[in-house]
């Protein structure tokens, strides 16, 4: 009996302690109005998360450094690149780069040796990072205005823009706003502008909240394991337009895109929710409002018929005229509560060990 009592006590202590990963299992509410409360309860600031985060991240957050960038002077640096280069390789501290409002015409890379970087714009102000890189000049994934290789990156209140003009049909028109290749990255209130291949959500666990992503074809693509929450997906241009091209290539890969409480908008009609760029894409839309711009078939027909059996295209409790399923392609999955649950918690991106809210400006 003594052994059993100790076991019960241990369990009670575990479930009562702050180490419990409640933020990984509490589902995102179906009511959009409840999301702010849910977020505050499940993504608490560092001061309330000590002892629950990755040890390296805890050490970094405990020793923060702030850099001011103002292109008009009065800060530590006038360019974002200069601020990033001032961070030593093998950095172990959270470095918050506060950006004064303005237009920063730079092609920025956050190297793998510089983790724990935050790019922080001022809420309510216009802070634009712009560049006109193209695939013809740099190659597709290297054309991005912002490239992040480092882990534990965070950005908030930024507009990240590829200013290259809309490509003509049949040209090498890829021009990225961002490529995110680092694990454990979060984006809050960021806007991404481009046309073809706007956002390369490449590899790692990523979180997007209150963002806006605009493009034409495959404007979110890559191999990431990412949760998009309350984010607007806006298609522009005409002709063939596709939102998501996920690059999953086998059932063993633990990745995919989960869009929750998002809005699909755009101009014209016939926009596809996704396509099978590779053999095993995983893309799920939950509680998402789909306007009439969405193609009635939902998803682009697979060019390789064998992929009909390997794609995972899920829709769960979506709304709006574009969510009607009567004409969806046969391999669309109208998933049930149990199946949807895995895409509706922060556990999908293992958030309990690393996800933090944005810092104050």
UniProtKB/Swiss-Prot annotation:
Keyword Lipid metabolism included in the entry's annotation: no
Site positions (Transition state stabilizer): 196
Sequence positions that bind substrate: 174, 275, 277
Keywords from the named record: Aspartyl esterase, Cell wall, Cell wall biogenesis/degradation, Glycoprotein, Hydrolase, Secreted, Signal
Glycosylation sites: 128
GO biological process, one term: pectin catabolic process
KW Isomerase (keyword) present: no
Pathway in which the depicted protein is active: Glycan metabolism; pectin degradation; 2-dehydro-3-deoxy-D-gluconate from pectin: step 1/5
Subcellular location: Secreted, Cell wall
EC numbers on record: 3.1.1.11
Cellular component GO terms, alphabetical: extracellular region
Purpose: Acts in the modification of cell walls via demethylesterification of cell wall pectin.
Protein family according to the UniProt entry: Belongs to the pectinesterase family.
The protein, known as: Probable pectinesterase 49
Organism field: Arabidopsis thaliana
Gene from which the chain derives: PME49
